[in-house]
From Swiss-Prot:
Subunit structure: Part of the 50S ribosomal subunit. Forms a bridge to the 30S subunit in the 70S ribosome.
Listed name of the protein: Large ribosomal subunit protein uL2
Keywords: Ribonucleoprotein, Ribosomal protein, RNA-binding, rRNA-binding
A GO MF term: rRNA binding
Any one GO CC term of the record: large ribosomal subunit
InterPro entries assigned to the protein according to its UniProt record, in alphabetical order: NA-bd_OB-fold, Rib_uL2_dom2, Ribosomal_uL2, Ribosomal_uL2_bac/org-type, Ribosomal_uL2_C, Ribosomal_uL2_CS, Ribosomal_uL2_dom3, Ribosomal_uL2_RNA-bd_dom
Record function comment: One of the primary rRNA binding proteins. Required for association of the 30S and 50S subunits to form the 70S ribosome, for tRNA binding and peptide bond formation. It has been suggested to have peptidyltransferase activity; this is somewhat controversial. Makes several contacts with the 16S rRNA in the 70S ribosome.
Domain of life: Bacteria
Family that this chain belongs to: Belongs to the universal ribosomal protein uL2 family.
Record-linked Pfam families: Ribosomal_L2, Ribosomal_L2_C
Location of region: Disordered: 222-277
Any one of the GO BP annotations: cytoplasmic translation
Length: 277
């Protein structure tokens, strides 16, 4: 998919760069594969803000995407490619030979009419699913499982992928986009190919209103707040905060490591922080 630029008829149009979605299906999603989605506005069940600067935006319908691909050795044909407001990647509607339909993440170079298959040993082509232990070294994959049978968790965003770089007994070594290398069990599955819509990184929203359509509210800095609202707040006139940058809850920001899951550290061979100078 290419990028679209617009004639500068307004200030917002002048800056706007969008992904050309003309090749995607223009109708509504399959009703049986959708769910209603409640707009939480960044609040949790007690009504308190847990994610700041969220709210408003266009009403969305959730598309149920199959991250597990448990229909083994049953071919499916790609019926159409669709836009999904809940994620940056595009999704594909597939129809199995038994007549059931499902949505999957659309990989790059997947076209309408292609056949995809999940199994222990399948062809290495975009959209096919197989255990990591059965893939050749160097394979580009996405939607990678971390726990056997849980469904894909890694490399699901637009344009992302992971690469199989080695084997270690029952495990394989996977290199992620961040530079991290980690061990994943060979029986965990992954989908072959990179995720669709790689041009997502090059879009320009163009105007504040388009951010509001996406449900993003203005992000205001701590130094502009009052002391009751933020550790950086207060002061006479404009101040620089007067302390090392912290979150509204007083925890150091700007890159301090917060990972505390020590039990899974053994699976990380090369940290993503190692490549930062």
């Amino acid at each position: 998919m290419a990028l679209k630029k617009f004639n500068p008829t307004t200030p917002g149009q002048r800056q706007l760069v969008m992904v050309d979605r003309s090749a995607l299906y223009k109708g509504k999603p399959v009703k049986s594969l959708t769910e209603g989605k409640h707009s939480a506005g960044g609040r949790n069940n007690t009504g308190r803000i847990v994610v700041r600067f969220r709210g408003g935006g266009h009403k969305q319908t959730y598309r149920i995407v199959d991250f597990k691909r448990t229909k083994v050795d049953m071919p499916a044909v790609v019926e159409r490619l669709e836009y999904d407001p809940n994620r940056t990647a595009f999704i594909a509607l597939i129809k199995y030979t038994d007549g059931t339909q499902a949505y999957i993440l659309a990989p790059q170079r997947l076209a309408v009419g292609d056949t995809v298959l999940a199994g222990a040993y399948v062809d290495v082509k975009p959209g096919n699913v197989m255990p990591l232990g059965n893939m050749p070294i160097g394979t580009i994959v996405h939607n990678v499982e971390l726990k056997i049978g849980k469904g894909g968790q890694i490399a699901r965003s637009a344009g992302t992928y992971a690469q199989l770089v080695g084997r270690d007994h029952d495990y394989v070594i996977v290199r992620l986009n961040s530079g991290e290398q980690r061990l994943v069990h060979g029986r965990c599955t992954a989908t072959i190919g990179a995720v669709s819509n790689p041009d997502h990184m090059n879009i320009s929203i163009g105007k504040a209103g388009r951010s509001r359509w996406l449900g993003r509210k203005p992000h205001n800095r701590g130094v502009t707040m009052n002391p009751v609202d933020h550790p950086h707040g207060g002061g006479e006139g404009r101040t620089s905060g007067g302390r090392h940058p912290v979150t509204p809850w007083g925890k150091p920001t700007k890159g301090k490591k917060t990972r505390s899951n020590k039990s899974t550290n053994k699976f990380i061979l090369i940290s993503r922080h190692k490549r930062k100078k």
